Amino acid sequence: MEESDIYYWKGVAVRMAEQVERAVSPLVGTEDAGEIIKMGADGTPTKLIDLVAEDEAVGVLESTGRPVTIISEEIGVLHINSEGDEPGIIFVVDPLDGTSNAIRNIPFYGISVAVAERHPDGAAPTLNNVLMGFVKNFATGDLYWAIKGQGAFLNEKAISSSSQSSLDRTSLGAFIYGTRFRRVDSICRVIRRMRILGSVALELAYVASGSYDAFMDLRENLRIVDIAASKLIVEEAGGVVTNERGGEIDGLLNVKARTSLVAAGNLELHEKIMQTLEVI
């Protein structure tokens, strides 16, 4: 992607985050926010606040007048401003990550936006095609972002992941629902503390900034679209992201693709977490 295009699409992504934030703000903490409207393309119920967020995100892309594809949990895949060929630019969007938090007015929810470029040969796009990632915490206004090869940032300040490598001093975020208790218990016994905050994209952003030392989701049910932005941000900050077997996560950019995930601020800590999981 040309530098001018990077600058342009970065501006679009930031504007999308700002406009979605404004659109959902009146619904946060209200009973109406949780009303189920339909079933989303990913097979899960779409709530009113999700639909409002996604409609606003689509509107931002429509307003550019440029051909672009959006991939989102509720709508699936939509080609915008396009006639004929599939657009070369892809926005992978979770318009509201942490929906339950937003409905209950728990201040930990936001948007995840990844910008990818389609393979010239027409191959299906994967996580490796993601060039930019943006995760905004609507409750605080903080924007975590990265451009491939250019580092990671919190607002305008460069960030780096944690250098903590001792398990007994590690703060770990996790999504553990549906995970076998033995696996969770084995980790809890060796780390300092565990946090469960309810937004994977934002918790991975915490790994990137060093607020968390590590994060894991072992369900094999984590949507690729949910981590498309934050995976890049963690890696650009110096962190390590793999599946629970230590393999690369390079899933297809679609709403059906799922994975497990183990992220750490550095390779040494990641290896220690993997060793703990392997003995179970």
From Swiss-Prot:
What CDD domains does the annotation carry? Arch_FBPase_1 (cd01515)
Q: Which gene encodes it?
A: suhB
The residues that hold Mg(2+) 2 are: D94, D97, D226
According to its UniProt entry, the protein's GO biological process terms are: inositol metabolic process; phosphatidylinositol phosphate biosynthetic process; signal transduction
- What is the protein name for this chain? Fructose-1,6-bisphosphatase/inositol-1-monophosphatase
Q: Which organism is it from?
A: Methanothermobacter thermautotrophicus (strain ATCC 29096 / DSM 1053 / JCM 10044 / NBRC 100330 / Delta H)
Q: What is its EC number?
A: 3.1.3.11, 3.1.3.25
Task: Say if the entry is tagged with keyword Metal-binding.
Answer: yes
Q: Which reaction does it catalyse?
A: beta-D-fructose 1,6-bisphosphate + H2O = beta-D-fructose 6-phosphate + phosphate; a myo-inositol phosphate + H2O = myo-inositol + phosphate
Indicate whether Magnesium appears among the record's keywords.
yes
